[in-house]
Amino acid sequence: MSFSVDVLANIAIELQRGIGHQDRFQRLITTLRQVLECDASALLRYDSRQFIPLAIDGLAKDVLGRRFALEGHPRLEAIARAGDVVRFPADSELPDPYDGLIPGQESLKVHACVGLPLFAGQNLIGALTLDGMQPDQFDVFSDEELRLIAALAAGALSNALLIEQLESQNMLPGDAAPFEAVKQTQMIGLSPGMTQLKKEIEIVAASDLNVLISGETGTGKELVAKAIHEASPRAVNPLVYLNCAALPESVAESELFGHVKGAFTGAISNRSGKFEMADNGTLFLDEIGELSLALQAKLLRVLQYGDIQRVGDDRSLRVDVRVLAATNRDLREEVLAGRFRADLFHRLSVFPLSVPPLRERGDDVILLAGYFCEQCRLRLGLSRVVLSAGARNLLQHYNFPGNVRELEHAIHRAVVLARATRSGDEVILEAQHFAFPEVTLPPPEAAAVPVVKQNLREATEAFQRETIRQALAQNHHNWAACARMLETDVANLHRLAKRLGLKD
């Protein structure tokens, strides 16, 4: 088989039709899966010796949340090291990263696999992976044809990453530095709430404004602070963390501002506080609502004038610190109750951010579950950790009062339990491995009982005829793709279609 000009043009057109990078990536992957008639395709971004899925087709949704470290995935490492098309034989001893992650084929190993490394100049920026259940599925495509596909994908990904770099550095194209992947804290989620939060982080990161991050316990407020710092001009300097809730009143002032030798009993030497440590960088004050009113007043002075006094010292020190604060309280209510200073609240909340709870993030729970499954796989040295359909359904309908932190602990516990019930290094998480209280799953919809007007043979043929019609429509009348969807041999499908009057 060879690609026609029309096929390549169609791929290029789909890339241009997309609205935004994510849509273009998804169109590319979906089109490639149809053109190459494969069971699964994925576009991956390369960053810090790991591949990060950007778009998938034919794979379980939790794949989008997984982070594939090269050390744990020899096939992906081989793709990263190669400068050209990589074909893995059906009998390859290297495990496929997608084994168990193709819906409907969880118990089968992937047979055919092709990897296409993507480059921008000499820099590896990503990869395309193509997988099929038939051992010779990609033999009909030459390396040259696959290189054309890789070139189109590399161009799309390179442009997207360059635009991302320009936006993050607030540069005009004429000032662009040589292509370099932008380091980012990975905030996993594609829900509207998380998409909006990521946009707001991009906006505020480039400024020097103080930020108040609010959200329930376990939603990931510290991750938001890290993302702001890493995308800011202060990223080359430290991000210093202080949990205000864990500060004893007796040492709180010293922790924040430092002390000099002899300032109090036990002060045997000079000590820098968190503000000094964060000079020219960022200070993250977690659980800011737990600070006493006395400390709030001293913190306000630092924000107003930019100077601090160590405990026991009469001299002032100038510091240049950006403050990011987080709380799980409603600070407006705390102000009204007299437990939080109104002037400090207004100083901190120049640019407020709200982190949505997990129960409002829809399918993000599955992406996050995939991320934690992959973490457990690496930590425990397992070959694979996958979610069953029942486990995914359970996760999507649980309320998660503890948010992302509760999900993380639940996945880790489930992996340990599942591992104990079966031998080998493969773990499949079932619903019974999760100990969630009072989870009410939606009942299956009751199907209406049809009035029988046909004999069994006629009813069976009518059902087969309609099923094939729907499969053909979904696969653009591609008989090979239709056969794979229906899990039957393509020759048998042709014979059945002729008998049913669907083919001449």
Swiss-Prot record:
Residues bearing PTM 4-aspartylphosphate: D57
Key word Isomerase present: no
InterPro entries given in the database record: AAA+_ATPase, GAF, GAF-like_dom_sf, Homeodomain-like_sf, NorR, P-loop_NTPase, Sigma_54_int, Sigma_54_int_dom_ATP-bd_1
Protein keywords: ATP-binding, DNA-binding, Nucleotide-binding, Phosphoprotein, Transcription, Transcription regulation
Matching SUPFAM superfamilies: GAF domain-like, Homeodomain-like, P-loop containing nucleoside triphosphate hydrolases
Ranges annotated as DNA-binding: 479-498
Claim: Phosphoprotein is one of the keywords in the record: yes
CDD domains assigned to the protein according to its UniProt record, in alphabetical order: AAA (cd00009)
UniProt-listed HAMAP family: NorR
Protein name: Anaerobic nitric oxide reductase transcription regulator NorR
Source organism of the structure: Escherichia coli O6:K15:H31 (strain 536 / UPEC)
Gene behind this protein: norR
